[in-house]
Amino acid sequence: AAKESIATPELAFTISDSGIGGASRNFHKWGRNWKIAHGNVERRILLNSWEGVYMDINEKGMDQMMGDIASMGGELFVMDDGWFGDKYRRVTDNSSLGDWVVDRQKLPHGIGWLVETAEKHGIRFGIWIEPEMTNTKSELYEKHPDWVVKAQNRDLVTGRGGTQLLLDLSNPAVQDFVFGVVDNIMTENPDIAYIKWDANMDISAHGSQYLKNQNHLYIEYHRGLAKVLDRVRAKYPDLTIQACASGGGRANYGIMPW
């Protein structure tokens, strides 16, 4: 539009007299020194619960895994997917995303008990979330079907479990919700040291129920994500955030500042 401006992604380049290896090391040094949050801080040795128990989370198992990693000199335990859901419990991957309340059948004493248990073992505690997502089988989607990325006059495009959907971060209400996911967890449990921020679906449904200009979705989605992450980092500057995204789906310099 007239008089409208847009900031494109930054371009970084390097010169190397040692081939590709030298160029790679240059970028690594630049990333640690200038881009990634806490880039030169020594990272804690951690154990993540996912491959050990998947979604079969319970207090006894988490306590045991914390004790195991502590006994080996580890410093951090991260509880992965499967800890949440009320009306729809997260026992498989086809439900509950967006319903970020503790499953009291699995964890009757809540997250606070796990944080305290980690401290008793002499380690820190971290937690998994996927705040940009929901499922068709969730209380969030039942309340806000207009919050998901969806092309007009087209069926839903679903991801993992056949039910996963992407929330539309171009929508300020969705931005507030996603920030609130992190803020609520951290407000209730301020000693959490680490968040594993997953994102197992990309923008595969090319439409917004919020935007007037549909071709702005990609740009406005990422602007919205940046606004959320700016708010998170401003309020929780010392929190370590892992950009998981099915492993390395967000391993890029653009996400590193947060």
Region spans (language model):
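Short, well-ordered coil/turn segments that N-cap beta-strands
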Residues: V41-I45, G73-E75, H121-F125, D191-A193, ...
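Short glycine/proline-rich turn/loop motifs
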Residues: R44-W50, G159-Q164
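A generic structural signal for short, non-catalytic loop/turn and secondary-structure boundary residues
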Residues: I6, G39-N40, A234
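Residue-level marker for beta-strand->alpha-helix junctions and adjacent short loops that shape enzyme
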Residues: F13, F84, E132-T134, D202, ...
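Active-site neighborhood of glycoside hydrolase catalytic domains
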Residues: D103-G110, T117-K120, E142-W258
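Short Pro-Gly-centered flexible turn/kink motifs
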Residues: A2-D17
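Terminal connector regions
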Residues: T14-R44, E51
